Design a protein with these regions (language model features):
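Structural preference for beta-rich elements and adjacent junctions enriched in aromatics
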Residues: 23-262
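Bacterial N-terminal signal peptides that target proteins for export
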Residues: 2-12
Length: 262
């Protein structure tokens, strides 16, 4: 019986490890500075592997020409680099105010947890849920306003974003993003929506072996009042039927390890 129990324990540990590895990603260090221009013509991108964006988190499953996507991720000491290739037959941005109902417009969503510690981040900066809009502005939810209302903030200092459609059919969207990584000490005033002038937050330096929490997703809307599809890089386990949990908790992020195999 003890041998059987030990064997069962070993199998369970192995299954857990395999399960965790299914959600683990590695990002290769870029040997050059990547220019964010939507062209993706740096040789460095050839060192990174494509990863799918194919897990339905909200809405019904879109057809391949309605939405399909994949991404690559790299890094250097100053930032993460993302190359996202998207098939989207209709690009839609219905709200002029970048902070108003931004999740119902087409946007790229970058989830990032600097120390991979997990936990709630819905109304704080324990982790970030950057919604990068078609106008290349980045929005997240900050601490609540004094009156208790939600506080949607622009974090454009964190993100550099450029996209363009390919001239070749089927005219995919080529979206390049660089992300300066901030830890959970990041703060900003509740009302002004501007970085604290007394102590301007600084991004962390990245290094080989560092682990971050990470997930990528896309909000797709072809002209409806609300988004029609929400597709991510991770198949999140539903809680009470809800998979749209990334903006609430970093516990659902995958683990991204920065490596340098040169």
């Amino acid at each position: 019986m003890p041998k059987y129990a030990d064997y069962l324990k070993f199998i369970m540990t192995l299954l857990m490890a395999v399960s965790m590895n299914c959600f683990a990603l590695e990002a290769q260090k870029s040997p050059e500075k990547i220019r964010i221009d939507g062209l993706a013509n740096e040789v460095s991108w050839q060192l990174a592997k494509w990863q799918p964006i194919n897990s339905l988190l909200l809405g019904d499953k879109p057809s391949a020409d309605d939405f399909s996507g994949q991404f690559k991720v790299m890094w250097d000491e100053q930032q993460l680099y993302l190359l996202v290739e998207i098939t989207d037959d209709v690009l839609f941005d219905q709200h002029a105010d970048p902070r108003h109902l931004y999740w119902d417009d087409d946007c790229l969503e970058i989830f990032l947890d600097e120390d991979a510690s997990g936990g709630n981040h819905q109304f704080n900066f324990n982790a970030f849920a950057y919604h990068v809009a078609l106008d290349n502005q980045a929005v997240d939810i900050g601490e609540k306003n004094v009156d208790g209302s939600d506080n949607f903030v622009l974090l454009n200092d964190h993100i550099t974003s450029v996209w363009r459609r390919s001239e070749k059919s089927p005219n995919k969207v080529i979206w390049e993003v660089s992300v300066r990584v901030y830890d959970d000490n990041f703060t900003m005033p509740v009302k002004q929506g501007m970085p604290n002038q007394n102590k301007v937050p600084q991004p962390v330096n990245l290094f080989s072996g560092k682990k971050l929490g990470f997930m990528l997703a896309y909000c797709d809307n072809d002209g409806s009042k609300e988004r029609e599809h929400f597709i991510g890089s991770i198949d999140i386990k539903a809680v009470k039927g809800n998979k749209n949990l990334g903006y609430i908790t970093a516990d659902v992020f995958s683990q991204l390890t920065l490596i340098d195999s040169r």
